[in-house]
């Protein structure tokens, strides 16, 4: 019999909701703590910049047990995603489990000798308290604390009326109207904000980035939805993955010329479609060498605006501020009223005790997580949403279903600590030696190996999987409804008080 646990889920974003639902559905008592005043994570209205929308199509950016409304466009806007998440929480009875405006300051092993953790919590009114939990699901993900970039001269820049803000704080399009906007970064949020600033009437818009990267348009060649290219098993199998034998390696070697030609063809198409040479934004890196979770979607209008000068593109980074001017690393000087730092988020779990931090993160920043979910040296704890991908919600959903069974000892393939550590060592070597591109974000990215990752999780859970037409399945994106059917075949159980 599985004993009921009191589970603390840290974070009420996409991953936290998945974890809360998974543990509650198995009979556990769940408390979800969220430092902000609303659910949604990056989709919380206070954090979402104007015109933000999903990079993934709606049939992929969803939970297995709830589709997005048919009325939504293929790539839903921020308010629509937030409404979907709110409805998901409500439909699974999670509203009563949420505690907003509550930050986890620290955690330590329980003093009463029982399994679990004691969390020190602080609310926005300054009140603090300690609470014991039997299990902790960390769902803060990779987009938690905004990165900062302290530079000389920034106080003088602000004193003259300049504004410096992280992209997550660019919440009002009117902010740009009639002003000089400089955006630092090469991510989709950077190009989204640059385009929004132009459309909002900014007097000048400049985007600053180190090197151009490959961006994928929503429709490759203007015709083919990119999900038919990036999200299919056939594409994934062009990359040699971990744990393959001699026969599979030989097959990859034989197919290498065809795979090479495939990528060169895609590069040529992107150069023509996006006019990369005209924009002087042809990447140096081969496209296949950089396929990971950082591959951005091309913001509609971005390249045309660069081509006609509405957006000025500068290579480099900020060096310092000089009055109302930003001086770049290459010496260029750009006048600015607003500096938007689209430089991402800090990766880490700051409330974890130092001795456990060392067990979680390698000296080179790589995370030690089995299936990107659990570490045998961090007992009574797991991570959801640290298996980032092109289909984030589906990844979080499957990870949450895996984690609750792992916590309850109910996986069909329940791993031993030795098995977990051996697998972690193998995956670390794969990221460092065989595919360095897999090491981005601390190695917390399953792209382009979505299907292999999902296959491993389902096999561990003990689901029955069947494919009516394996050939068709090889050329179609992941089907969330199919994964719901697979999960329904796993052994059922309920925790008891």
Q: Positions of the model-derived regions?
A:
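N-terminal glycine-rich dinucleotide-binding loop that anchors FAD/FMN and/or NAD(P) in oxidoreductases
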Residues: 47-69, 226-237
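Short, well-structured alpha-helical segments that form the helix of a local strand-helix-strand
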Residues: 419-424
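Non-catalytic, mobile gating and regulatory segments of ester bond hydrolases
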Residues: 165, 425-431
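Flavin (primarily FAD) cofactor-binding/catalytic cores of flavoenzymes
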Residues: 2-51, 55, 67, 72-219, ...
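Compositionally biased, charge-rich terminal segments
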Residues: 205-253, 429-437, 447
